[in-house]
Amino acid sequence: MKPAGATLNLLTLDIEDWRQLIRLRFTGEVCSPGREVVGETNALLQAMADLNVHATFFVLANVAVTFPELVRLIHQQGHEIASHGYSHERIYRQKPEQFRAETRKAKSLLEDITGAPVLGYRAAEFSITAQSWWALDVLSEEGFAYDSSVFPIAGRRYGVPNALLAPNRIHTRSGNAIWEFPLTAVELWKHRLPVGGGGYFRLTPYGLTRLALQRVNQQGRPAVVYLHPYEFAEEKLEIALPRLSLRQRLILVRYSWLHNFGRRRLCARFRRLLGEFGFLSVRDWLHKKGDSL
């Protein structure tokens, strides 16, 4: 049961196809997403409809190209459509010109499908870091009102350890301004720990996640929860890739194990989370704050 007057948190879903991204990562092969992403997303939509919860869907544009009807369905059910880029290439591996072109293309595609402005962006693998901070200028110049790519932790592949923990308005190096909605972390013994998203949500006992989110709300900030449709897949996530080296095969085994762990209980855990905490989309949070978009 949600307490009256509880802090409203932000529910975000990254719409991407697991097998497509694994192929890209391990072989460099660019292929179309599988139809599994449609069924997995529909299961998420049903869970949210049952509890009257709306979210922000960060849609990878190559999923939208293949399944535009899925994007329309999400939009028609009252959820926010935001951009997850086009190719799922990490930003710090791109040049600014390449990033701008891809970002503009993805934004235009999603707006053409829904007929509504796309306000938000999330980078592949949270790849807005100190190395790619310039991307915030590009996003602001391309008409985005907010970003949700910064993980305020010291991670191996991502993270900005000195970033603010709460949503904040960033003034970029070129004098532009854009809202940042960092992924959720809590401070414990001078360390920042990620909570409430993806593998962190699946691998952490639910009771600890609940305590962490309660602590975040007690500090007056909303939690930014993120999940992926493939985490709700009924079948095991696995893929056979030929011509991998032994090292690559071992890495793939580790990836598969991490992405499969905790999935069987995830749907029940997700519904419990939605029942115990208040959630809304980033767009609606900004509207409630009175920000003109």
Feature names for model-found ranges:
Residues 41-45, 68-72, 100-107, 136, ...:
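Generic structural signal for well-ordered alpha-helices
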Residues 2, 21, 116-117, 123-226:
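Active-site-adjacent pocket scaffolds in enzyme catalytic domains
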Residues 28-35, 54-60, 87-99, 123-127, ...:
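The substrate-binding groove and active-site-proximal loops of carbohydrate-active enzymes
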Residues 50-51, 203-293:
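C-terminal domain-boundary segment and adjacent tail
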Residues 2-77:
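Active-site beta->alpha N-cap acidic-glycine motif
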Residues 51-132, 144, 149-156, 175-177, ...:
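Metal-dependent polysaccharide deacetylase catalytic core of the NodB/CE4 family, i.e.
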Residues 17, 87, 231:
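Short, glycine/acidic-enriched loop or turn micro-motifs at the edges of active sites
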